[in-house]
Amino acid sequence: KLTVKENLMMIARLHGSSKQEAREKADKIMATFELTDRKNDRAKQLSGGWQRKLSIAMALISNPKILFLDEPTIGLDVRARRELWGTMEKLKGKLTLILTTHYLEEAEELADRICIMDKGIVQVLGTADEIIKVSGARNFEEAFLMYTERGTEL
């Protein structure tokens, strides 16, 4: 039943920050993720999109080098998905972000490198353009279908 700010401060404290440092980190990350206006809202009362932003902010408050996001936009409406994409774009170059998704446009839009798997086996790894080129497909969706329908490397 913690507020947005209390959640962020709690995570910072768990990672060794003093109360003052935790407050400063919370304020900074709330500004980064546009959560400042929601700082006194209870986390459980936030919409799905705001909850995802808070979750990512909580994960980042300890300054990790790698962040894993498993289907972060599943179940979000188009507007919330696009807002979260903007949040993820802000992270580029600051840490390694590993994202799992079933949304092809999300992978194509956000990823520097994409790994297509089929039945747990890596089929291809590269940029969206490289995957399209090596597959001979007209677009990324067609390339994805080629790699996943065949189940073998092209």
State what each model feature region is:
Residues 63:
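Conserved catalytic motifs of ABC-family nucleotide-binding domains
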Residues 9, 13, 20-38:
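Conserved ABC ATPase "signature" region
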Residues 94-102:
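Conserved H-loop
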